[in-house]
């Protein structure tokens, strides 16, 4: 019996084949020409370069992590393209042409040559149609009139991806890559004891990215875009890069920490068995920029605490995979503050918890309102991260936060919602007080 295969490419290089067995299992095999190539690198650090079939769970988990987390979105993909199932192979058969990182998946009978960029420019009305497609049960902005527009964007939020050419937003054709992730408002999330109003998530994330950049963290550029009544966040993809002549858009290999550790997305949170700070810091010891990456990762943990970012799980940290299998940390992404949803029918500040715990005198500390500088210092000590560097990170935040908040506020567009600014700023300054008292900074 002939088993169905998907050929995996990185840019115009054939990497290997993904096979779905009769029992539904997924196997992967690197192509001999890829193993011999000077560009060779593992598809994932959980799938080392080797000859023969790889049959470990890491194969299924790697490809599954390329897909949206939401079962609802996956069902929409099945419905839109008549996919055979919600299994990674069957979904990626339909939407694997432009995935996260450098992965392109196409059927055996298709070939990839040196890519010729092709796209369709969107009018404002057409852009609005793409951005509101999810309301009509259409996944990832893949509207019915565009059968050639097939992308896969991981994550839990409603989003799509588009190509930016000059000032125009475009739908890519064929295997032309996208340049931006377009994120839609999350809306309301109903929980047993609260309703979380994230209808302003676009503004929230934009604000957090600006503040992160102002404080020296490596984050992607982003802008708020509008089409008709739609307000969305366009985030520049750091897994894409134009060639020198700006004629070809290259895909850059990367993977998230669930893929790195060979884990399913269902355990992306430390509380569910996923990696925490200690595991990721140990992994970053092997980075090609280990000292910088470990410093930046610890700095980002403090930033998440200050802004009340509760979603810093394993899928929200990634590494670039370089030739030969070396790796380094990517920019930080998917940053949103929980402070604007406090109060009313929302949640109490005592309910806010970091996704990855800090070391305390007894066990782990995750409750944001119970965390103090000493918990970061205790964590650094356990990790053998230099105490002087941890003090430097904390004291720098103590010194920089007030001016950074002012600078971000003055740079915001005039129609930016004041309640988002007030909620984040008030709580950041309250937690900042713990730093300023510790380091004697007024």
How would you name each of these model-derived features?
Residues 1-314, 318-442:
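Phosphate/dinucleotide-binding and metal-coordinating scaffold of catalytic cores
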């Amino acid at each position: 019996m002939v088993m169905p295969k998907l050929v995996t490419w990185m840019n115009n290089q054939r990497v290997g084949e993904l096979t779905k067995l009769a029992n539904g299992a997924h196997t992967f095999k690197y192509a001999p020409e890829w193993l011999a190539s000077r560009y060779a690198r593992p598809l994932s650090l959980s799938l080392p370069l080797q000859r023969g079939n790889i049959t470990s769970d890491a194969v299924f988990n790697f490809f599954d992590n390329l897909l949206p987390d939401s079962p609802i979105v996956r069902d929409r993909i099945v419905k839109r393209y008549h996919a055979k199932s919600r299994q990674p192979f069957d979904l990626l058969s339909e939407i694997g042409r432009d995935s996260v990182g450098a992965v392109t998946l196409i059927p055996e009978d298709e070939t990839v040559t040196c890519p010729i960029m092709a796209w369709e420019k969107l009018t404002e009305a057409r852009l609005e149609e793409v951005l509101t497609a999810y309301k009509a049960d259409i996944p990832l902005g893949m509207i019915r009139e565009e059968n050639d527009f097939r992308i896969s964007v991981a994550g839990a939020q409603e989003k799509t991806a588009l190509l930016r050419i000059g000032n125009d937003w475009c739908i890519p054709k064929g295997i032309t890559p996208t340049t931006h992730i377009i994120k839609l408002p999350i809306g309301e999330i109903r929980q047993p004891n609260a309703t979380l109003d994230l209808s302003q998530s676009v503004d929230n994330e934009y604000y957090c990215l600006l503040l992160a950049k102002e404080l020296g963290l490596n984050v992607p550029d982003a802008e708020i875009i509008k089409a008709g009544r739609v307000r969305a966040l366009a985030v520049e993809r750091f897994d894409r890069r134009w060639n020198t002549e700006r004629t070809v858009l290259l895909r850059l290999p990367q993977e998230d920490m669930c893929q790195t550790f060979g884990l399913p997305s269902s355990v992306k949170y430390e509380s569910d068995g996923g990696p925490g700070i200690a595991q990721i810091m140990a992994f970053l010891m092997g980075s090609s920029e280990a000292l910088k990456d470990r410093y930046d990762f610890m700095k980002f943990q403090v930033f998440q605490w200050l802004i009340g970012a509760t979603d810093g799980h394993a899928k929200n940290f990634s590494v670039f995979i370089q030739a030969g299998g070396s790796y380094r940390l990517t920019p930080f992404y998917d940053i949103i503050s929980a402070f604007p949803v406090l109060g009313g029918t929302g949640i109490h500040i005592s309910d806010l918890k970091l996704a990855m715990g800090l070391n305390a005198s007894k066990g782990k500390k995750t409750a944001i309102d119970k965390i103090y500088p000493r918990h970061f210092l205790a964590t650094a000590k356990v990790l053998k991260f230099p105490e002087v560097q941890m003090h430097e990170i904390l004291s720098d935040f103590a010194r920089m936060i007030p001016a950074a908040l002012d600078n971000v506020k003055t740079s915001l567009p005039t129609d930016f919602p004041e309640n988002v600014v007030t909620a984040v700023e008030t709580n950041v300054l309250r937690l900042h007080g713990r730093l300023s008292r510790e380091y004697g900074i007024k």
